Swiss-Prot record:
GO CC annotation: cytosol
Protein name: Glucose-6-phosphate isomerase
Gene Ontology MF, one: carbohydrate derivative binding
Role played: Catalyzes the reversible isomerization of glucose-6-phosphate to fructose-6-phosphate.
Catalytic reaction list: alpha-D-glucose 6-phosphate = beta-D-fructose 6-phosphate
Enzyme type, top EC level: isomerase
SUPFAM superfamilies attached to this UniProt entry: SIS domain (SSF53697)
Entry annotation: catalytic residues: E355 (proton donor), H387, K515
GO biological process: gluconeogenesis; glucose 6-phosphate metabolic process; glycolytic process
Phylogenetic classification of the source organism: Bacteria, Pseudomonadati, Pseudomonadota, Gammaproteobacteria, Pasteurellales
Keywords: Cytoplasm, Gluconeogenesis, Glycolysis, Isomerase
Cross-referenced InterPro entries: G6P_Isomerase, G6P_Isomerase_C, Phosphoglucose_isomerase_CS, SIS_dom_sf, SIS_PGI_1, SIS_PGI_2
């Protein structure tokens, strides 16, 4: 990948000038100027996903400059570098090949001259066999009973991706009950264990190194809980599987290494649900549906890799997002799914985006001080959010671009629930774009029989300025295929922005310092002695903790 400071490109300079030209043009104005705006600013994928980006402060000139920016920042060669296994994660000297995990064509993908696809397919075949044994009831626990509950123990990408997907695809779940434990807070594992029976519970321990503090602490507590009931060490092998590469420690824990599913250092945690880390997904929805998830992602990979920039959905979303943050001043983006099954989708891409692009040092090692990298990502399902934080989106002083996501078809078509849900989905983007003027507010009062003199003091508070940018992502139906495509779409959006920001999107050094300090503090918490080895604030907090515990 080439290291190019985006602000040194001609396109960036053109965008800065263009921003001034557009400064007095609103989204309302743009819709008046361009009669076919919806047709010209929307894209479809596989006739199953519609992405409408027309309600943004952009015109064709904006898009032209943004596309030129992508070209000047060598996006095309960066894409090929990723897909062909170049070590684009330079700070860890690793390839970035989550796309190989869902490479359904089996076209060779080389890392250090070796095709990774045979190993990928071997793990998938092993996962398929394991799923069949668990789901069919062939696999038995220590008392001869079939498995009824699966507890995935992981953290970060080993938890959030599988949890998000199993929740999103609950309509496809089988009889197995899925549970996810991530937090090292003992409450998380304790409350989960209250819900399950040791005789019929399978634990998946998801840790590549089998040394992750939170995961191994929870796994050890689960092991202790099982053995308290089973009273026989041999029971561990019947109730635990590992998603790991550390065979020595897996075996030492008591897990049969035949039930260890490996993945590779070219799979980043937040991009790992497509790997063995997705075993909980495959157990929940069945392996055929897991393959459909991979198929959807693979189709989006092909779209991203080969579709021209003008019709390229992930690239377009990335460029529009970059325009909103770096030229219009937005610091956050909201992801607002109008689908209760997608209730963890925003949290998943909060990790995906912020851990990838939350960087302040560029690929040359220079501090970035003249442009903004990754935005803050947040969100909740609609319509809940409407009764919580939409007030600020509509009438606050902060610009918050939003992605609205909704399925055209519901898995639960109860009465008129879905029409009511979707009426809100459509209404919100219309309200955010077009607002309500003072004159419209006054006309409403007059129509209601009110005197303008009586209501003049309330009128300003009912005005909506509009001109708030949104994308609308309408999915025909949330299926394993479309969900796979949707997730891959956001993954590639993150990649494109990282390329243009000139940062390394696939490391996460920012998580290390806190872990190092926690390891230093942990031994200090074992006794009641006062500490004085830190700053006065940290000393004071630790000492008060010791007094109160």
């Amino acid at each position: 990948m080439k290291n190019i400071n985006p602000t040194h490109t001609q396109a960036w300079k053109s965008l800065e000038a263009h921003k001034a030209e557009l400064s007095n043009t609103t989204i309302q104005d743009l819709f008046k100027q361009e009669k076919n705006r919806f047709d010209d600013y929307s894209l479809t994928f596989n006739n199953q996903i519609l992405v409408d980006f027309s309600k943004n402060n952009i015109n064709q000139t904006t898009l032209s400059h943004l596309r030129q920016l992508a070209q000047e920042c060598a996006l095309d060669s960066a894409k090929e570098a990723m897909f062909t296994g170049e070590k684009i994660n330079r700070t860890e000297n690793r390839a970035v090949l989550h796309t190989a995990l869902r490479n359904r064509t089996n076209t060779p993908v080389l890392v250090d001259g070796k095709d990774v696809m045979p190993e990928v397919n071997a793990v998938l075949a092993k996962m398929k066999d394991f799923c069949q044994r668990i789901i069919s009831g062939e696999w038995k626990g220590y008392t001869g009973k079939a498995i009824t509950d699966v507890v995935n123990i992981g953290i970060g990408g080993s938890d959030l991706g599988p949890y998000t997907v199993t929740e999103a695809l609950r309509p496809y779940k089988n009889h197995l009950n899925m549970h996810f434990v991530s937090n090292v807070d003992g409450t998380h594992i304790a409350e989960t264990l209250k819900k399950v029976n040791p005789e019929t519970t399978l634990f998946l321990v998801a840790s590549k190194t089998f040394t992750t503090q939170e995961t191994m602490t929870n796994a050890q507590s689960a092991r202790d809980w099982l053995l308290k009931a089973a009273k026989d060490e041999s029971a561990v092998a019947k109730h635990f599987a590992a998603l790991s590469t550390n065979a020595k420690d897996v075996e030492k824990f008591g897990i049969d290494t035949n039930n260890m599913f490996e993945f590779w250092d070219w799979v980043g945690g937040r991009y790992s649900l497509w790997s063995a880390i997705g075993l909980s997904i495959a157990l929940s929805i069945g392996f055929e549906n897991f393959e459909a998830l991979l198929n959807g992602a693979h189709e989006m990979d092909k779209h991203f890799r080969s579709t021209p920039i003008e019709q390229n959905i992930p690239t377009t979303l990335a460029l529009v997002g970059l325009w909103n943050t770096n030229f219009l001043g937005a610091q956050t983006e909201a992801i607002l799914p109008y689908d209760q099954y997608l209730h963890r989708f925003a949290a998943y891409f909060q990790q995906g985006n912020m851990e990838s692009n939350g960087k302040y040092v560029d690929r040359d090692g220079n501090v970035i001080n003249n442009y903004q990298t990754g935005p803050i990502i947040w969100g909740e399902p609609g319509t809940n959010g409407q009764h919580a934080f939409y007030q600020l989106i509509h009438q606050g002083t902060t610009l918050i671009p939003c992605d609205f996501i909704a399925p055209a078809q519901s898995h639960n078509p109860l009465a008129d629930h879905h029409n009511k849900l979707l009426s809100n989905f459509f209404a919100q983007t219309e309200a955010l774009a077009f607002g309500k003027t003072k004159e419209e507010v006054e006309a409403e009062f007059i129509k209601a029989g009110k005197s303008l003199d009586d209501v003049k003091n309330i009128v300003p508070f009912k005005v909506f300025t509009g001109n708030k940018p949104t994308n609308s992502i309408l999915v025909q139906k949330i299926t394993p295929f479309t969900l796979g495509a949707l997730i891959a779409m956001y993954e590639h959006k993150i990649f494109v922005q990282g390329v243009i920001f000139n940062i390394f999107s696939f490391d996460q050094w920012g998580v290390e310092l806190g872990k190092q300090l926690a390891n230093r503090i942990l031994p200090e918490l074992t006794d009641s002695e006062k500490v004085a080895s830190h700053d006065s604030s940290t000393n004071g907090l630790i000492n008060q903790f010791k007094t109160w515990r």
